[in-house]
């Protein structure tokens, strides 16, 4: 019996057959559209399934990776050994008054739409971020002068020892693209956001404005993971990359976007290696020309 069959046996009592995929192509599950296969991909739709899955993985020493919408991830060409737990089906959103509680697989744009429907303001910035709630809380995602830390009330997380705990906003220790969840290797289960009442017309106007701005300034027509690099203190990554003469620079099928140099795109059937080589080249050039270190915002996982 091969390893994948062993995995299927371990999880067969917990999942329907349709929730278990063997040798799933990760290129079909991440926005970059690259990456080799994972041994087993599971799509839980309940908290109990998530908790039990992680428990089984730990008890059997199976490596696992929790994936939201795959919007800020780069999977290497040889794929992932072990289990990927994809939370796209764990996506309920419930509004109570001025608060919205969302499961970690819920898309940010859907939470933003729910807020708009109830004339709640504060989440407009997230209307076009392609990520999920779990990933956004994990890295304190943000855009256009807004970020998760401005609106989150608390998050329900799973700690390394398998306990479900609730962390307040302060306990989440949200900073620029970082959090206590990231530092402690916790897993987001749900997040609760708190908003202010606003005027629906103004909220709609802001959402429309930001949507147009994204379409105008970001290379949405190509697969990417959004902003490739974190913002270096005192600088903008895109400006440094452009000033380094790297606009439209291509390596293999990967390219620095001519529309926004902060984005590395899959321009023409790129491999993960193409993208990683380009990331490294950009880092070296910016360091050489300006003495500034660029650090990837995208999470890189898998085997070479």
Curated annotation (Swiss-Prot):
<dbReference type="Pfam" id="PF01565">
    <property type="entry name" value="FAD_binding_4"/>
</dbReference>
<keyword id="KW-0961">Cell wall biogenesis/degradation</keyword>
<dbReference type="GO" id="GO:0008360">
    <property type="term" value="P:regulation of cell shape"/>
</dbReference>
<feature type="active site">
    <location>
        <position position="297"/>
    </location>
</feature>
<comment type="similarity">
    <text>Belongs to the MurB family.</text>
</comment>
<dbReference type="GO" id="GO:0071949">
    <property type="term" value="F:FAD binding"/>
</dbReference>
<keyword id="KW-0521">NADP</keyword>
<dbReference type="InterPro" id="IPR036318">
    <property type="entry name" value="FAD-bd_PCMH-like_sf"/>
</dbReference>
<keyword id="KW-0573">Peptidoglycan synthesis</keyword>
<dbReference type="InterPro" id="IPR003170">
    <property type="entry name" value="MurB"/>
</dbReference>
<feature type="domain" description="FAD-binding PCMH-type">
    <location>
        <begin position="33"/>
        <end position="198"/>
    </location>
</feature>
<dbReference type="Pfam" id="PF02873">
    <property type="entry name" value="MurB_C"/>
</dbReference>
<dbReference type="InterPro" id="IPR016167">
    <property type="entry name" value="FAD-bd_PCMH_sub1"/>
</dbReference>
<dbReference type="InterPro" id="IPR016166">
    <property type="entry name" value="FAD-bd_PCMH"/>
</dbReference>
<keyword id="KW-0131">Cell cycle</keyword>
<dbReference type="InterPro" id="IPR006094">
    <property type="entry name" value="Oxid_FAD_bind_N"/>
</dbReference>
<comment type="function">
    <text>Cell wall formation.</text>
</comment>
<dbReference type="InterPro" id="IPR016169">
    <property type="entry name" value="FAD-bd_PCMH_sub2"/>
</dbReference>
<keyword id="KW-0285">Flavoprotein</keyword>
<keyword id="KW-0132">Cell division</keyword>
<keyword id="KW-0133">Cell shape</keyword>
<feature type="active site">
    <location>
        <position position="177"/>
    </location>
</feature>
<keyword id="KW-0963">Cytoplasm</keyword>
<dbReference type="GO" id="GO:0051301">
    <property type="term" value="P:cell division"/>
</dbReference>
<dbReference type="GO" id="GO:0071555">
    <property type="term" value="P:cell wall organization"/>
</dbReference>
<comment type="pathway">
    <text>Cell wall biogenesis; peptidoglycan biosynthesis.</text>
</comment>
<protein>
    <recommendedName>
        <fullName>UDP-N-acetylenolpyruvoylglucosamine reductase</fullName>
        <ecNumber>1.3.1.98</ecNumber>
    </recommendedName>
</protein>
<keyword id="KW-0274">FAD</keyword>
<dbReference type="GO" id="GO:0008762">
    <property type="term" value="F:UDP-N-acetylmuramate dehydrogenase activity"/>
</dbReference>
<keyword id="KW-0560">Oxidoreductase</keyword>
<feature type="active site" description="Proton donor">
    <location>
        <position position="227"/>
    </location>
</feature>
<dbReference type="InterPro" id="IPR036635">
    <property type="entry name" value="MurB_C_sf"/>
</dbReference>
<dbReference type="InterPro" id="IPR011601">
    <property type="entry name" value="MurB_C"/>
</dbReference>
<dbReference type="GO" id="GO:0009252">
    <property type="term" value="P:peptidoglycan biosynthetic process"/>
</dbReference>
<dbReference type="GO" id="GO:0005829">
    <property type="term" value="C:cytosol"/>
</dbReference>
